[in-house]
From Swiss-Prot:
One of the protein's GO biological processes: ATP synthesis coupled electron transport
Cofactor note: Binds a dinuclear copper A center per subunit.
Cross-referenced Gene3D superfamilies: 1.10.287.90, Cupredoxins - blue copper proteins
Taxonomic path: Eukaryota, Metazoa, Ecdysozoa, Arthropoda, Hexapoda
Keywords: Copper, Electron transport, Magnesium, Membrane, Metal-binding, Mitochondrion, Mitochondrion inner membrane, Respiratory chain, Translocase, Transmembrane, Transmembrane helix, Transport
Protein name: Cytochrome c oxidase subunit 2
The organism's place on the tree of life at top rank: Eukaryota
Amino acid sequence: MSTWSMMNLQDANSPMMEQLIFFHDHTLMILLLITITIIYIISSIIMNNLTNKFIMQNQTIEIIWTIIPMIILIYMAIPSLKILYLNDEINNPLMTIKSIGHQWYWSYEYSDFKNIDFNSFMINSKNLNHFRLLDVDNRMIIPMNNQIRMLINSADVIHSWTVPSLGVKIDSVPGRINQTLMMINRPGIYFGQCSEICGMNHSFMPIVIESTSNNNFISWLKSL
């Protein structure tokens, strides 16, 4: 969960988020090297007293500054495309959960075991036993270390179902069902928010996912 003055990304709690953090660091290192190189070139131009000011063209230099950026872009594109296709790949999920966005709350449907559906509203901020503007009355509970297919839809306007620590951000569009695969590595409680401005109470649409063991998940299903 993000905290005040936090500069880093949230800890990865899913394989997808681990890949996204790796890509972020990979790209950041390339940008750092480019920045250092440009600073060196500008400094050398300033400090060399315009030694080469009469050079009008140089084919070798033109080839170099054309090929090197191409190589850099390819080096950045390969991991990006890998993550892009992994994000769309869904292979034999354990279960399917449907999340429907409303103004201004979420509802969830579990239809694989028995027909379970419930609404998830933000808890009043006056209740000091919960995180302000983040906790809900009914959490989405899933088993850890299992592939879960999420179907995202909207009943009114465009929303966005987003959980940063899991690397999940799916648009919730009326009349359209988007899907993604999600797997959580460890037990815990993970917080998210609607990330699409959807009206007056847009900032009061928290998402809370509780990851637990298979046995606890089955016990929860039986209790409903």
